[in-house]
């Protein structure tokens, strides 16, 4: 059965986060700032990276041959304790984007930053819509996203939106069993995760990152 929805929202100017200045000598790096919600305190950064980010990072390396840095940041009042349950998912994303932008402006710009993404990790779904649950939300080609740990594919799905991947170009593959690529909007319980993007979305991501260099 279909178990989840992953909406992508159009990027608005008021929620755009600017990437830091890159010097000519710096190595361009894609930086993912990961903010585990305070409710995830029992999960270590190492465990989160192993379970939810390693295969995704391998996929990005394959697509773009680009250094990827994941920076876990915890216990930031106003960010990692934000209320995300019981409100509209798009409203939660707007709140998160504003909070992340405020925080980012207070931080020094890391040398070599190519692009920065800001991801809030949550334990639970964001919203129920009838028989469906919304487990993640992101601005398309934006910098802000929220992903629940309810599915191992949600992190890759939402970060994919920020890198220009789309639902329409997701597909079903076969790796010993039928599997869904990262960008499937509604997961079907009998299919596994491919832990990769479709060829079309790989091309979208590669072109997006190429334009930033």
Where are these predicted regions, by residue range?
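Positively charged n-region of N-terminal signal peptides that target proteins for export
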Residues: 1-5
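Structural recognition of the beta-strand scaffold that forms the well-ordered cores
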Residues: 31-34, 117-121, 146, 162
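Bacterial N-terminal signal peptides
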Residues: 7-18
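The catalytic-center signature of Zn2+-dependent metalloproteases
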Residues: 138-213
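Propeptide-to-catalytic entry region of secreted or membrane-anchored zinc metalloproteases
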Residues: 21-110
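Catalytic zinc-binding patch centered on the HExxH motif and its immediate surroundings
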Residues: 100-113, 122-140
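Solvent-exposed loop/turn segments at secondary-structure junctions
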Residues: 37-41, 76-79, 123-128, 152, ...
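Short, polar loop/linker segments at the starts of domains and inter-domain junctions
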Residues: 44-51, 133-135, 194-197
């Amino acid at each position: 059965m279909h178990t989840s929805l992953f909406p992508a929202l159009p990027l608005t100017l008021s929620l755009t986060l600017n990437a830091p200045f890159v010097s000519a000598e710096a190595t361009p790096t894609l930086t993912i700032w990961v903010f585990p919600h305070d409710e995830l305190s029992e999960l270590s950064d190492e465990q989160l990276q192993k379970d939810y980010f390693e295969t995704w990072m391998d996929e990005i390396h394959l697509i773009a041959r680009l250094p990827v840095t994941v920076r876990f940041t915890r216990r930031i009042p106003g960010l990692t304790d934000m209320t995300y349950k019981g409100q509209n998912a798009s409203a939660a994303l707007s709140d998160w984007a504003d909070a992340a932008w405020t925080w980012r402006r207070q931080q020094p710009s890391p040398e070599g930053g190519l692009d920065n993404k800001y991801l809030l990790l949550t334990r639970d779904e964001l919203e129920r819509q009838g028989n469906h649950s919304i487990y993640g939300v992101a601005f398309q080609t934006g910098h802000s996203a929220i992903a629940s740990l309810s599915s191992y594919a949600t992190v890759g799905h939402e970060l994919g939106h920020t890198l220009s991947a789309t639902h329409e170009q997701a597909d079903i593959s076969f790796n010993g069993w039928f599997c869904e690529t990262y960008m499937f909007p509604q997961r079907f319980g009998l299919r596994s995760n491919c832990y990769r993007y479709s060829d079309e979305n790989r091309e979208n991501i590669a072109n997006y990152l190429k334009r930033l260099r």
